[in-house]
A protein has these predicted regions:
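Specific transmembrane helices
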Residues: 1-121, 149, 196, 217-267
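Residue-level signature of the transmembrane alpha-helical core
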Residues: 5, 45-46, 113-118, 147-154, ...
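Small-polar-interrupted transmembrane alpha-helices in polytopic inner-membrane proteins
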Residues: 52, 142-161
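Hydrophobic/aromatic residues in alpha-helical transmembrane segments
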Residues: 54, 132, 187-191
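Membrane-interface interhelical connector segments
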Residues: 76-98, 127-134, 161-172
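Active-site His/Glu-centered metal-binding helix of metallohydrolases
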Residues: 122, 126-127, 131, 155, ...
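Membrane-interface helix/loop boundary segments of multi-pass membrane proteins
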Residues: 123-150, 196-201
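Functionally important transmembrane alpha-helices
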Residues: 147, 169-234
Length: 267
């Protein structure tokens, strides 16, 4: 679990080298800067659930069986079981979180939300958008910078099992980076789009990543464990279509080139 915090740790170390403790302090302060407007927070929090809701509605219209709300009665137990599935963690943290979630519905909700914010939002976004994108953006178009981050982000997700397979000539593992490249392409562009409209605040993109994780896990593992309501390829396709729409709508900011030394305001 703690390996997920590699991007955050790398960003803090590099910023400390570049700007010392003052630079680190300014960087950490960007996590909670409330400089973004309401639209950024609305997109960050509600776009992912809205896409999932539309997909579920379309499936229902096409006659695909959709679980009823009554099937959510056991959501607390589903969260506990989901966490226990990671009990191999050597730190014992997931066991503690599962125990906490089992104590009541409020505890389960807080654990679930907190985990989605921490693992992905806080662990990754400071590194990928807060550091990598912020340094690739000056002198480039936003969409180009987001594509450079996309490649690094996708291959970072492959993990040690992928590289072990490569060294053992187990070529089936090549599907791992291909999968992550497909999944993270639309997300990298969408996250960058929100970030450049957030006036230097990382909070909206942290919440966006958290909202995506919470939605994805909910419809694939929590609502009906073992029987995803929405197949991951369908979700990825929906986000890709959404990204194409965003590129059309936000092409002025995504294709504008940010001058070197320019401030945090969106171009």
């Amino acid at each position: 679990m703690f390996a997920q915090y590699g991007p955050l740790c790398a960003a803090v170390i590099l910023i400390a080298i570049e700007g010392g403790l003052k630079g680190v302090g300014q960087f950490l302060a960007s996590f909670v800067k409330l400089r973004a407007g309401f639209p950024s927070y609305a997109v960050a929090l509600f776009l992912s659930p809205a896409i999932a809701a539309v997909l579920i509605g379309l499936n229902r219209l096409h006659g695909t069986p959709v679980p009823t709300m009554a099937s959510l009665e056991g959501w607390q137990a589903h969260i506990v079981d989901y966490l226990r599935g990671f009990s191999h963690s050597s730190t014992g943290l997931t066991h503690f979180l599962a125990q906490t979630a089992s104590r009541g519905r409020w505890q389960a909700a807080l654990v679930y939300i907190g985990l989605c914010v921490a693992d992905g939002g806080i662990s990754e976004e400071p590194g990928w958008r807060g550091y990598a994108f912020a340094r690739l953006y000056p002198g480039r178009r936003a969409i180009v910078a987001s594509l450079w981050v996309w490649i690094m982000w996708a291959f970072w997700h492959t993990g040690p099992d992928f590289w072990t397979g490569i060294f053992k000539s187990d070529w089936k593992v090549l599907f791992t980076p291909i999968t992550y490249l497909v999944v993270t392409l639309p997300l990298s562009i969408l996250f960058a789009w929100v970030f450049i409209h957030s006036n230097g605040s990382l909070l909206p993109v942290i919440l966006f990543h958290a909202s995506y994780n919470a939605t994805f896990i909910f419809v694939t593992a929590i609502w009906t464990p073992g029987k995803p309501i929405l197949p991951p390829p369908e979700i990825s396709l929906a986000f890709l279509i959404t990204t194409l729409l965003v590129i059309g709508i936000g092409r002025r900011s995504l294709f504008a080139r940010k001058s070197r030394g320019e401030g945090d305001r969106p171009v």
